[in-house]
Swiss-Prot record:
Function in brief: With S4 and S5 plays an important role in translational accuracy. Interacts with and stabilizes bases of the 16S rRNA that are involved in tRNA selection in the A site and with the mRNA backbone. Located at the interface of the 30S and 50S subunits, it traverses the body of the 30S subunit contacting proteins on the other side and probably holding the rRNA structure together. The combined cluster of proteins S8, S12 and S17 appears to hold together the shoulder and platform of the 30S subunit.
Protein name per the record: Small ribosomal subunit protein uS12
SUPFAM superfamilies: Nucleic acid-binding proteins
Organism: Salinispora tropica (strain ATCC BAA-916 / DSM 44818 / JCM 13857 / NBRC 105044 / CNB-440)
Subunit field text: Part of the 30S ribosomal subunit. Contacts proteins S8 and S17. May interact with IF1 in the 30S initiation complex.
Domain of life: Bacteria
Length: 124
């Protein structure tokens, strides 16, 4: 335990927190170009074919991003918007693609949680 005099001289050092999305370089989102669109399988208790894309960001870093929702129109050279947010059962996937922006279309026939998937309000 430091004395008062030691605290006056040096002060306390604030704990540094490591960022969970280093490729975004402090931005909320970043634009990128798809270099590869493919499916991969999740970790042990789960079983599926998860849609992911390898994306080269405007910060010149290449990351793996998850494509949320049912169905997508992405292919190589598609321009996408990438946000942070990991996928728990896909190791190494720490980013998600924003649906309904740039080249990514929103999910069709989506009724609930539409804003998350870039789906427009259906005309009744």
């Amino acid at each position: 335990m430091p004395t008062i005099q030691q605290l006056v001289r040096k002060g306390r050092q604030a704990k540094t927190t490591k960022t969970k999305t280093p490729a975004l370089k402090g931005s909320p989102q970043r634009r990128g170009v798809c270099t590869r669109v493919y499916t991969t399988t999740p970790k042990k208790p789960n079983s599926a074919l998860r849609k992911v894309a390898r994306v080269k960001l405007s910060s010149q870093i290449e990351v793996t991003a998850y494509i949320p929702g049912v169905g997508h129109n992405l292919q190589e050279h598609s321009i996408v918007l990438v946000r942070g947010g990991r996928v728990k059962d896909l190791p190494g996937v720490r980013y998600k693609i924003v649906r309904g922006s740039l080249d990514t279309q929103g999910v069709r026939n989506r009724k609930q949680a539409r804003s998350r998937y870039g789906a427009k309000k259906e005309k009744s």
